Amino acid sequence: HDALPICSSDLRPLGIPCIEDRLIQQCIKQVLEPICEAKFHAHNYGFRPNRSTHHAISRMTFLANRAHLHYVVDIDIKGFFDNVNHGKLLKQMWSLGIQDKSLLTIISKMLKAEIEGIGIPQKGTPQGGILSPLLSNIVLNELDWWISNQWETFEPRHKYTSYNKFSALKSSKLKQMYIVRYADDFKLMCRDYETAQKALIAVKNWLKERLDLDISPEKSKVINIRKNYSNFLGFKLKVIKKGRKKVIKSNINDKATKKVISVILERIKELKKSPTVKTVNRYNASILGCHNYYRYATYVNIDFSKIAFLVSNNLYNSTKRIRGKTGSKSKAYINYYGNYNIKTVYIAGIALFPIAGIKTKNVMNFSQNICDFTKEGRELIHDKLKGINQNILQYIMENPIQGETTEYNDNRVSLYVGQKGKCSVTGEPLLISNMDCHHKISRELGGKDEYANLTFVICDIHKLIHAITKETIQNYMNKTQKFINESSLIKINKLRKLVGNCELYIS
Protein backbone atom coordinates (compact mmCIF):
# COMPACT_ATOMS: atom_id res chain seq x y z
CA HIS A 1 0.00 0.00 0.00
CA ASP A 2 1.02 3.59 -0.60
CA ALA A 3 -0.57 7.05 -0.70
CA LEU A 4 -1.44 8.92 -3.89
CA PRO A 5 -1.57 12.76 -4.13
CA ILE A 6 -4.93 14.15 -5.34
CA CYS A 7 -6.02 17.54 -6.67
CA SER A 8 -6.92 19.00 -3.27
CA SER A 9 -3.32 18.39 -2.06
CA ASP A 10 -4.55 15.66 0.32
CA LEU A 11 -3.35 12.08 0.15
CA ARG A 12 -5.57 9.23 -0.99
CA PRO A 13 -4.77 5.61 -0.02
CA LEU A 14 -3.71 3.69 -3.12
CA GLY A 15 -3.71 -0.08 -2.70
CA ILE A 16 -2.10 -2.00 -5.56
CA PRO A 17 -2.15 -5.69 -4.58
CA CYS A 18 0.67 -8.11 -5.35
CA ILE A 19 0.01 -10.98 -7.81
CA GLU A 20 -1.07 -13.40 -5.06
CA ASP A 21 -3.53 -10.89 -3.60
CA ARG A 22 -4.86 -10.05 -7.06
CA LEU A 23 -5.59 -13.73 -7.73
CA ILE A 24 -7.44 -14.05 -4.42
CA GLN A 25 -9.40 -10.83 -5.01
CA GLN A 26 -10.35 -11.97 -8.52
CA CYS A 27 -11.60 -15.30 -7.15
CA ILE A 28 -13.72 -13.47 -4.57
CA LYS A 29 -15.04 -11.08 -7.21
CA GLN A 30 -16.11 -13.94 -9.51
CA VAL A 31 -18.16 -15.41 -6.66
CA LEU A 32 -19.65 -12.12 -5.45
CA GLU A 33 -20.40 -10.43 -8.77
CA PRO A 34 -23.31 -12.69 -9.92
CA ILE A 35 -24.94 -12.31 -6.48
CA CYS A 36 -24.56 -8.53 -6.45
CA GLU A 37 -25.53 -8.01 -10.10
CA ALA A 38 -28.94 -9.54 -9.38
CA LYS A 39 -29.49 -6.97 -6.60
CA PHE A 40 -27.99 -3.83 -8.16
CA HIS A 41 -30.21 -1.05 -9.51
CA ALA A 42 -30.75 -0.92 -13.28
CA HIS A 43 -29.38 2.61 -13.65
CA ASN A 44 -26.14 2.13 -11.77
CA TYR A 45 -23.59 2.11 -14.61
CA GLY A 46 -20.26 2.28 -12.78
CA PHE A 47 -17.77 -0.63 -12.72
CA ARG A 48 -20.34 -3.15 -13.96
CA PRO A 49 -20.11 -5.71 -16.79
CA ASN A 50 -21.22 -4.44 -20.23
CA ARG A 51 -22.02 -0.94 -18.90
CA SER A 52 -20.06 2.26 -19.52
CA THR A 53 -20.05 6.01 -18.92
CA HIS A 54 -21.79 6.47 -22.27
CA HIS A 55 -24.79 4.46 -21.07
CA ALA A 56 -25.09 6.83 -18.10
CA ILE A 57 -24.95 9.85 -20.43
CA SER A 58 -27.56 8.17 -22.65
CA ARG A 59 -29.92 7.66 -19.70
CA MET A 60 -29.60 11.30 -18.63
CA THR A 61 -30.20 12.41 -22.23
CA PHE A 62 -33.28 10.18 -22.46
CA LEU A 63 -34.79 11.58 -19.25
CA ALA A 64 -34.27 15.15 -20.46
CA ASN A 65 -35.42 14.60 -24.07
CA ARG A 66 -38.30 12.17 -23.62
CA ALA A 67 -39.45 12.61 -20.01
CA HIS A 68 -38.79 16.39 -20.06
CA LEU A 69 -37.06 16.36 -16.66
CA HIS A 70 -35.01 19.54 -16.75
CA TYR A 71 -34.04 20.04 -13.10
CA VAL A 72 -30.87 18.20 -12.16
CA VAL A 73 -29.65 17.65 -8.60
CA ASP A 74 -25.84 17.59 -8.64
CA ILE A 75 -24.50 15.84 -5.54
CA ASP A 76 -20.81 15.58 -4.71
CA ILE A 77 -19.88 13.19 -1.88
CA LYS A 78 -16.82 14.38 0.02
CA GLY A 79 -14.02 11.83 -0.41
CA PHE A 80 -16.40 8.89 -0.88
CA PHE A 81 -13.76 6.18 -1.37
CA ASP A 82 -11.81 7.45 1.66
CA ASN A 83 -14.80 7.55 4.03
CA VAL A 84 -16.63 4.25 3.53
CA ASN A 85 -17.65 2.83 6.90
CA HIS A 86 -16.23 -0.72 7.14
CA GLY A 87 -18.83 -1.99 9.61
CA LYS A 88 -21.73 -0.64 7.56
CA LEU A 89 -20.26 -2.16 4.36
CA LEU A 90 -20.04 -5.63 5.91
CA LYS A 91 -23.66 -5.34 7.14
CA GLN A 92 -24.77 -4.30 3.64
CA MET A 93 -23.02 -7.36 2.19
CA TRP A 94 -24.82 -9.57 4.72
CA SER A 95 -28.21 -8.08 3.77
CA LEU A 96 -27.44 -8.72 0.06
CA GLY A 97 -27.14 -12.43 0.86
CA ILE A 98 -23.35 -12.68 1.25
CA GLN A 99 -23.40 -14.45 4.62
CA ASP A 100 -20.22 -16.54 4.62
CA LYS A 101 -18.45 -15.31 7.77
CA SER A 102 -15.03 -16.55 6.63
CA LEU A 103 -15.32 -14.54 3.42
CA LEU A 104 -16.49 -11.43 5.28
CA THR A 105 -13.49 -11.78 7.62
CA ILE A 106 -11.10 -11.88 4.64
CA ILE A 107 -12.71 -8.75 3.15
CA SER A 108 -12.55 -7.00 6.53
CA LYS A 109 -8.82 -7.74 6.80
CA MET A 110 -8.27 -6.58 3.23
CA LEU A 111 -9.95 -3.25 4.03
CA LYS A 112 -7.74 -2.82 7.09
CA ALA A 113 -4.45 -3.60 5.32
CA GLU A 114 -1.78 -1.25 6.62
CA ILE A 115 -0.79 1.77 4.52
CA GLU A 116 2.91 2.53 4.69
CA GLY A 117 3.57 5.69 6.67
CA ILE A 118 -0.10 6.09 7.70
CA GLY A 119 -1.02 2.93 9.55
CA ILE A 120 -4.18 0.82 9.64
CA PRO A 121 -7.14 2.66 8.04
CA GLN A 122 -10.34 2.84 10.08
CA LYS A 123 -12.51 3.67 7.07
CA GLY A 124 -12.40 3.84 3.27
CA THR A 125 -11.73 1.37 0.45
CA PRO A 126 -8.19 1.47 -1.00
CA GLN A 127 -8.28 2.35 -4.69
CA GLY A 128 -6.33 0.18 -7.09
CA GLY A 129 -7.63 -3.21 -5.96
CA ILE A 130 -9.73 -5.55 -8.09
CA LEU A 131 -12.46 -5.85 -5.46
CA SER A 132 -12.75 -2.16 -4.45
CA PRO A 133 -15.09 -1.03 -7.30
CA LEU A 134 -17.55 -3.82 -6.48
CA LEU A 135 -17.48 -2.89 -2.78
CA SER A 136 -18.14 0.77 -3.59
CA ASN A 137 -21.21 -0.27 -5.60
CA ILE A 138 -22.47 -2.33 -2.66
CA VAL A 139 -22.20 0.74 -0.40
CA LEU A 140 -24.26 3.01 -2.69
CA ASN A 141 -26.73 0.33 -3.83
CA GLU A 142 -28.90 1.13 -0.81
CA LEU A 143 -29.03 4.79 -1.92
CA ASP A 144 -30.00 3.77 -5.48
CA TRP A 145 -33.00 1.78 -4.31
CA TRP A 146 -34.06 4.34 -1.68
CA ILE A 147 -34.29 7.05 -4.36
CA SER A 148 -35.81 4.68 -6.93
CA ASN A 149 -38.55 3.64 -4.49
CA GLN A 150 -39.64 7.26 -4.10
CA TRP A 151 -41.14 7.07 -7.60
CA GLU A 152 -39.61 4.86 -10.30
CA THR A 153 -40.01 1.47 -8.58
CA PHE A 154 -42.65 2.49 -6.03
CA GLU A 155 -45.14 -0.35 -5.50
CA PRO A 156 -48.73 0.89 -4.94
CA ARG A 157 -51.21 -1.16 -2.94
CA HIS A 158 -53.43 -1.69 -5.99
CA LYS A 159 -52.44 -3.33 -9.26
CA TYR A 160 -52.32 -0.96 -12.23
CA THR A 161 -51.38 -1.11 -15.87
CA SER A 162 -48.20 0.80 -16.66
CA TYR A 163 -50.10 3.87 -17.89
CA ASN A 164 -52.62 3.89 -15.04
CA LYS A 165 -49.85 3.44 -12.47
CA PHE A 166 -48.13 6.56 -13.79
CA SER A 167 -51.41 8.51 -13.63
CA ALA A 168 -52.03 7.32 -10.07
CA LEU A 169 -48.52 8.31 -8.99
CA LYS A 170 -48.96 11.77 -10.54
CA SER A 171 -52.14 12.33 -8.55
CA SER A 172 -50.37 11.34 -5.31
CA LYS A 173 -48.01 13.46 -3.20
CA LEU A 174 -44.98 11.42 -4.27
CA LYS A 175 -42.10 13.35 -5.80
CA GLN A 176 -41.07 12.37 -9.33
CA MET A 177 -37.32 11.72 -9.47
CA TYR A 178 -34.91 9.36 -11.20
CA ILE A 179 -31.32 8.48 -10.35
CA VAL A 180 -28.47 7.99 -12.83
CA ARG A 181 -25.25 6.87 -11.18
CA TYR A 182 -21.70 6.08 -12.24
CA ALA A 183 -19.56 5.13 -9.19
CA ASP A 184 -19.81 8.05 -6.71
CA ASP A 185 -20.88 10.49 -9.44
CA PHE A 186 -24.67 10.64 -9.68
CA LYS A 187 -27.53 12.86 -10.79
CA LEU A 188 -31.16 13.11 -9.73
CA MET A 189 -33.52 14.16 -12.52
CA CYS A 190 -36.66 16.02 -11.39
CA ARG A 191 -39.57 17.82 -13.03
CA ASP A 192 -39.57 21.06 -11.01
CA TYR A 193 -37.32 23.14 -8.76
CA GLU A 194 -39.29 22.48 -5.57
CA THR A 195 -38.99 18.70 -5.97
CA ALA A 196 -35.30 18.97 -6.81
CA GLN A 197 -34.59 21.12 -3.74
CA LYS A 198 -36.41 18.69 -1.44
CA ALA A 199 -34.52 15.77 -3.03
CA LEU A 200 -31.19 17.48 -2.40
CA ILE A 201 -31.94 18.00 1.30
CA ALA A 202 -33.37 14.48 1.70
CA VAL A 203 -30.34 12.80 0.06
CA LYS A 204 -27.93 14.93 2.11
CA ASN A 205 -29.61 13.84 5.36
CA TRP A 206 -29.94 10.21 4.25
CA LEU A 207 -26.25 9.91 3.33
CA LYS A 208 -25.24 11.33 6.71
CA GLU A 209 -27.61 9.23 8.79
CA ARG A 210 -27.35 5.92 6.93
CA LEU A 211 -23.83 5.86 5.47
CA ASP A 212 -22.05 8.50 7.57
CA LEU A 213 -21.04 10.37 4.41
CA ASP A 214 -20.98 14.14 3.89
CA ILE A 215 -21.67 16.08 0.73
CA SER A 216 -19.80 19.14 -0.48
CA PRO A 217 -22.14 22.19 -0.08
CA GLU A 218 -20.25 24.19 -2.73
CA LYS A 219 -20.49 21.48 -5.40
CA SER A 220 -23.95 20.11 -4.52
CA LYS A 221 -26.78 22.16 -6.01
CA VAL A 222 -29.92 22.19 -8.16
CA ILE A 223 -29.40 23.11 -11.82
CA ASN A 224 -32.05 24.10 -14.34
CA ILE A 225 -30.48 22.67 -17.51
CA ARG A 226 -32.63 24.92 -19.67
CA LYS A 227 -30.47 27.79 -18.38
CA ASN A 228 -27.19 26.28 -17.18
CA TYR A 229 -24.90 23.34 -17.94
CA SER A 230 -24.65 20.26 -15.76
CA ASN A 231 -21.28 18.47 -15.75
CA PHE A 232 -21.28 14.68 -15.85
CA LEU A 233 -18.44 12.25 -16.64
CA GLY A 234 -16.40 14.69 -18.72
CA PHE A 235 -19.41 16.13 -20.59
CA LYS A 236 -21.50 19.23 -19.97
CA LEU A 237 -25.18 18.99 -20.84
CA LYS A 238 -27.83 21.64 -21.40
CA VAL A 239 -31.32 21.69 -22.92
CA ILE A 240 -31.79 23.90 -25.98
CA LYS A 241 -34.75 24.61 -28.23
CA LYS A 242 -34.78 22.74 -31.54
CA GLY A 243 -37.84 23.51 -33.63
CA ARG A 244 -40.82 22.86 -31.39
CA LYS A 245 -38.89 20.54 -29.10
CA LYS A 246 -36.34 20.94 -26.35
CA VAL A 247 -33.37 18.59 -26.67
CA ILE A 248 -30.05 17.97 -24.93
CA LYS A 249 -26.98 19.72 -26.25
CA SER A 250 -23.70 18.26 -24.97
CA ASN A 251 -20.11 19.44 -25.10
CA ILE A 252 -16.79 18.38 -23.62
CA ASN A 253 -16.72 20.11 -20.24
CA ASP A 254 -14.10 22.75 -19.40
CA LYS A 255 -12.03 20.55 -17.09
CA ALA A 256 -11.91 17.71 -19.65
CA THR A 257 -11.01 20.17 -22.44
CA LYS A 258 -8.00 21.37 -20.45
CA LYS A 259 -6.98 17.76 -19.83
CA VAL A 260 -7.24 16.87 -23.55
CA ILE A 261 -5.14 19.91 -24.49
CA SER A 262 -2.57 18.97 -21.83
CA VAL A 263 -2.31 15.40 -23.16
CA ILE A 264 -1.91 16.59 -26.78
CA LEU A 265 0.78 19.12 -25.83
CA GLU A 266 2.65 16.40 -23.95
CA ARG A 267 2.53 14.12 -27.01
CA ILE A 268 3.75 16.99 -29.25
CA LYS A 269 6.66 17.51 -26.87
CA GLU A 270 7.53 13.81 -27.21
CA LEU A 271 7.39 14.08 -31.03
CA LYS A 272 9.75 17.06 -31.00
CA LYS A 273 12.19 15.31 -28.69
CA SER A 274 12.12 11.95 -30.48
CA PRO A 275 10.32 11.80 -33.89
CA THR A 276 10.11 8.00 -34.11
CA VAL A 277 7.43 5.50 -35.12
CA LYS A 278 6.83 4.78 -31.42
CA THR A 279 6.13 8.41 -30.47
CA VAL A 280 3.95 8.96 -33.57
CA ASN A 281 1.87 5.88 -32.67
CA ARG A 282 1.61 7.14 -29.10
CA TYR A 283 0.39 10.53 -30.36
CA ASN A 284 -2.16 8.88 -32.68
CA ALA A 285 -3.37 6.57 -29.92
CA SER A 286 -4.03 9.57 -27.65
CA ILE A 287 -5.98 11.42 -30.36
CA LEU A 288 -8.06 8.34 -31.24
CA GLY A 289 -8.71 7.62 -27.55
CA CYS A 290 -10.02 11.16 -26.96
CA HIS A 291 -12.19 10.95 -30.09
CA ASN A 292 -13.64 7.58 -29.10
CA TYR A 293 -14.64 8.80 -25.63
CA TYR A 294 -16.00 12.26 -26.47
CA ARG A 295 -17.63 11.46 -29.84
CA TYR A 296 -21.00 11.12 -28.07
CA ALA A 297 -21.08 14.86 -27.35
CA THR A 298 -23.46 16.50 -29.83
CA TYR A 299 -21.07 19.43 -30.38
CA VAL A 300 -17.89 17.34 -30.37
CA ASN A 301 -16.77 18.57 -33.80
CA ILE A 302 -16.88 22.21 -32.68
CA ASP A 303 -15.06 21.37 -29.43
CA PHE A 304 -12.23 19.49 -31.14
CA SER A 305 -11.95 22.19 -33.82
CA LYS A 306 -11.32 24.69 -31.02
CA ILE A 307 -8.78 22.35 -29.43
CA ALA A 308 -7.05 21.89 -32.80
CA PHE A 309 -6.85 25.69 -33.18
CA LEU A 310 -5.44 26.15 -29.67
CA VAL A 311 -2.61 23.64 -30.20
CA SER A 312 -2.00 24.37 -33.91
CA ASN A 313 0.87 26.85 -33.38
CA ASN A 314 2.58 24.53 -30.93
CA LEU A 315 2.17 21.55 -33.28
CA TYR A 316 3.50 23.48 -36.29
CA ASN A 317 6.47 25.08 -34.53
CA SER A 318 7.48 21.86 -32.77
CA THR A 319 7.30 19.67 -35.89
CA LYS A 320 8.22 21.97 -38.81
CA ARG A 321 11.74 20.48 -39.03
CA ILE A 322 10.67 16.86 -38.72
CA ARG A 323 7.45 16.72 -40.76
CA GLY A 324 7.30 15.33 -44.28
CA LYS A 325 4.94 15.64 -47.23
CA THR A 326 4.65 11.94 -48.00
CA GLY A 327 4.28 8.74 -46.04
CA SER A 328 1.88 5.92 -45.27
CA LYS A 329 -1.63 6.04 -43.84
CA SER A 330 -2.47 3.25 -41.41
CA LYS A 331 -5.62 1.17 -41.64
CA ALA A 332 -6.97 3.07 -38.61
CA TYR A 333 -6.33 6.41 -40.37
CA ILE A 334 -8.20 5.26 -43.48
CA ASN A 335 -11.10 3.84 -41.43
CA TYR A 336 -11.56 6.81 -39.11
CA TYR A 337 -10.24 9.81 -41.02
CA GLY A 338 -10.18 8.79 -44.70
CA ASN A 339 -13.25 10.89 -45.56
CA TYR A 340 -12.02 14.14 -44.00
CA ASN A 341 -10.64 16.89 -46.23
CA ILE A 342 -7.85 17.85 -43.81
CA LYS A 343 -4.21 18.43 -44.72
CA THR A 344 -2.21 15.37 -43.71
CA VAL A 345 0.98 15.77 -41.68
CA TYR A 346 3.58 12.98 -41.84
CA ILE A 347 6.25 12.34 -39.21
CA ALA A 348 8.62 9.37 -39.41
CA GLY A 349 6.72 8.39 -42.58
CA ILE A 350 3.40 7.97 -40.71
CA ALA A 351 0.30 10.18 -40.98
CA LEU A 352 -0.71 12.03 -37.81
CA PHE A 353 -4.38 11.65 -36.90
CA PRO A 354 -6.22 15.00 -37.38
CA ILE A 355 -7.39 16.53 -34.09
CA ALA A 356 -10.49 18.07 -35.69
CA GLY A 357 -11.43 14.87 -37.58
CA ILE A 358 -14.43 13.82 -35.53
CA LYS A 359 -18.22 13.61 -35.95
CA THR A 360 -20.84 13.08 -33.28
CA LYS A 361 -22.29 9.62 -32.73
CA ASN A 362 -25.72 8.89 -31.28
CA VAL A 363 -25.49 7.56 -27.75
CA MET A 364 -27.54 4.42 -27.13
CA ASN A 365 -29.44 3.33 -24.02
CA PHE A 366 -28.27 0.19 -22.25
CA SER A 367 -30.43 -2.88 -22.83
CA GLN A 368 -31.33 -4.05 -19.32
CA ASN A 369 -31.74 -7.65 -20.52
CA ILE A 370 -28.00 -7.95 -21.25
CA CYS A 371 -26.34 -9.96 -18.49
CA ASP A 372 -23.25 -12.16 -18.28
CA PHE A 373 -24.93 -14.45 -15.78
CA THR A 374 -28.08 -15.60 -17.60
CA LYS A 375 -28.46 -17.62 -20.78
CA GLU A 376 -30.79 -15.01 -22.32
CA GLY A 377 -28.44 -12.18 -21.39
CA ARG A 378 -25.42 -13.90 -22.93
CA GLU A 379 -27.36 -14.47 -26.15
CA LEU A 380 -27.95 -10.71 -26.42
CA ILE A 381 -24.23 -10.04 -25.91
CA HIS A 382 -23.44 -12.35 -28.82
CA ASP A 383 -26.36 -11.09 -30.90
CA LYS A 384 -23.98 -10.05 -33.69
CA LEU A 385 -23.11 -13.72 -34.22
CA LYS A 386 -26.74 -14.60 -34.97
CA GLY A 387 -27.19 -15.68 -38.57
CA ILE A 388 -23.65 -17.05 -38.73
CA ASN A 389 -23.35 -20.78 -39.28
CA GLN A 390 -21.77 -21.95 -36.03
CA ASN A 391 -20.74 -25.30 -37.54
CA ILE A 392 -18.67 -23.59 -40.26
CA LEU A 393 -17.17 -21.20 -37.71
CA GLN A 394 -16.22 -24.15 -35.52
CA TYR A 395 -14.73 -25.94 -38.54
CA ILE A 396 -12.55 -22.93 -39.44
CA MET A 397 -11.34 -22.70 -35.83
CA GLU A 398 -10.53 -26.40 -35.55
CA ASN A 399 -9.02 -26.86 -39.03
CA PRO A 400 -6.28 -24.29 -39.64
CA ILE A 401 -4.62 -24.33 -43.08
CA GLN A 402 -1.43 -26.37 -42.74
CA GLY A 403 1.76 -24.51 -43.66
CA GLU A 404 0.16 -21.07 -43.21
CA THR A 405 1.06 -18.52 -40.55
CA THR A 406 -0.76 -18.25 -37.22
CA GLU A 407 -1.76 -14.71 -38.21
CA TYR A 408 -3.40 -15.99 -41.40
CA ASN A 409 -5.37 -18.72 -39.62
CA ASP A 410 -6.47 -16.41 -36.79
CA ASN A 411 -7.61 -13.79 -39.28
CA ARG A 412 -9.66 -16.37 -41.20
CA VAL A 413 -11.80 -16.85 -38.07
CA SER A 414 -12.24 -13.10 -37.53
CA LEU A 415 -12.92 -12.57 -41.22
CA TYR A 416 -15.70 -15.17 -41.36
CA VAL A 417 -17.45 -13.47 -38.42
CA GLY A 418 -16.76 -9.99 -39.84
CA GLN A 419 -18.33 -10.92 -43.18
CA LYS A 420 -21.25 -12.59 -41.37
CA GLY A 421 -20.54 -15.85 -43.17
CA LYS A 422 -21.12 -14.35 -46.63
CA CYS A 423 -19.03 -13.89 -49.77
CA SER A 424 -17.65 -10.33 -49.88
CA VAL A 425 -18.45 -10.07 -53.62
CA THR A 426 -21.78 -11.82 -54.14
CA GLY A 427 -23.25 -11.87 -50.64
CA GLU A 428 -23.90 -15.62 -51.00
CA PRO A 429 -23.56 -17.79 -47.86
CA LEU A 430 -20.12 -19.39 -47.59
CA LEU A 431 -19.94 -23.19 -47.38
CA ILE A 432 -17.05 -25.35 -46.18
CA SER A 433 -16.78 -26.81 -49.69
CA ASN A 434 -17.23 -23.45 -51.42
CA MET A 435 -15.12 -20.75 -49.78
CA ASP A 436 -11.62 -19.40 -50.41
CA CYS A 437 -9.63 -16.88 -48.40
CA HIS A 438 -8.19 -14.47 -50.99
CA HIS A 439 -5.15 -12.19 -50.56
CA LYS A 440 -6.18 -8.80 -52.00
CA ILE A 441 -2.52 -8.01 -52.68
CA SER A 442 -0.77 -11.28 -53.47
CA ARG A 443 2.28 -12.37 -51.53
CA GLU A 444 4.35 -12.13 -54.71
CA LEU A 445 3.54 -8.39 -54.80
CA GLY A 446 4.34 -7.91 -51.11
CA GLY A 447 0.92 -8.66 -49.62
CA LYS A 448 0.79 -9.90 -46.03
CA ASP A 449 -1.48 -12.12 -43.97
CA GLU A 450 -3.03 -9.21 -42.07
CA TYR A 451 -6.81 -8.93 -41.68
CA ALA A 452 -7.16 -5.93 -44.03
CA ASN A 453 -5.48 -7.86 -46.87
CA LEU A 454 -7.80 -10.88 -46.72
CA THR A 455 -11.34 -11.52 -47.91
CA PHE A 456 -13.57 -14.60 -48.14
CA VAL A 457 -15.15 -15.32 -51.55
CA ILE A 458 -16.83 -18.35 -53.09
CA CYS A 459 -14.46 -20.58 -55.11
CA ASP A 460 -15.62 -19.65 -58.64
CA ILE A 461 -15.32 -15.93 -57.87
CA HIS A 462 -11.80 -16.56 -56.53
CA LYS A 463 -10.83 -18.28 -59.78
CA LEU A 464 -12.40 -15.46 -61.79
CA ILE A 465 -10.30 -12.90 -59.90
CA HIS A 466 -7.10 -14.72 -60.89
CA ALA A 467 -8.20 -15.82 -64.40
CA ILE A 468 -5.99 -14.53 -67.25
CA THR A 469 -6.93 -16.28 -70.51
CA LYS A 470 -10.13 -15.44 -72.37
CA GLU A 471 -11.33 -19.05 -72.24
CA THR A 472 -10.90 -19.29 -68.46
CA ILE A 473 -12.52 -15.91 -67.89
CA GLN A 474 -15.50 -16.82 -70.09
CA ASN A 475 -15.84 -20.20 -68.39
CA TYR A 476 -16.08 -18.70 -64.90
CA MET A 477 -18.21 -15.78 -66.07
CA ASN A 478 -20.73 -18.37 -67.26
CA LYS A 479 -20.51 -20.31 -63.99
CA THR A 480 -21.06 -17.18 -61.87
CA GLN A 481 -23.56 -15.53 -64.21
CA LYS A 482 -26.42 -15.63 -61.69
CA PHE A 483 -24.27 -13.79 -59.11
CA ILE A 484 -22.81 -11.15 -61.43
CA ASN A 485 -24.43 -7.72 -61.48
CA GLU A 486 -23.11 -4.18 -61.71
CA SER A 487 -22.22 -4.00 -58.02
CA SER A 488 -20.46 -7.39 -57.83
CA LEU A 489 -18.56 -6.70 -61.08
CA ILE A 490 -17.14 -3.49 -59.59
CA LYS A 491 -15.92 -5.49 -56.58
CA ILE A 492 -14.40 -8.20 -58.81
CA ASN A 493 -12.58 -5.60 -60.92
CA LYS A 494 -11.17 -3.91 -57.81
CA LEU A 495 -9.78 -7.24 -56.63
CA ARG A 496 -8.45 -8.09 -60.13
CA LYS A 497 -6.62 -4.75 -60.36
CA LEU A 498 -4.94 -5.38 -57.00
CA VAL A 499 -3.45 -8.66 -58.29
CA GLY A 500 -2.42 -7.05 -61.59
CA ASN A 501 -5.18 -8.36 -63.88
CA CYS A 502 -7.29 -6.41 -66.38
CA GLU A 503 -10.88 -5.33 -65.74
CA LEU A 504 -13.86 -7.37 -66.94
CA TYR A 505 -16.92 -6.10 -68.80
CA ILE A 506 -20.37 -7.56 -69.31
CA SER A 507 -21.17 -7.67 -73.01
Enumerate the language-model features and the residues they cover.
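A conserved non-catalytic segment of reverse transcriptases
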Residues: 112, 117, 210-275, 281, ...
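Short, contiguous acidic/charged loop-to-helix segments that flank catalytic cores in large enzymes
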Residues: 398-414, 441-450
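Short, solvent-exposed helix-loop connector elements
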Residues: 13, 122-125, 249, 265-279, ...
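Short cysteine-rich loop/turn motifs with clustered Cys
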Residues: 1, 402-436, 458-460
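Extended C-terminal regions of large enzymes
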Residues: 310, 317-403
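Histidine-centered nuclease catalytic patch
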Residues: 427-459, 467-476
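Conserved polymerase palm-domain catalytic core
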Residues: 1-5, 39-51, 55-217, 222-225, ...
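Non-catalytic, peripheral interaction segments enriched in hydrophobic/basic residues
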Residues: 275, 279-338
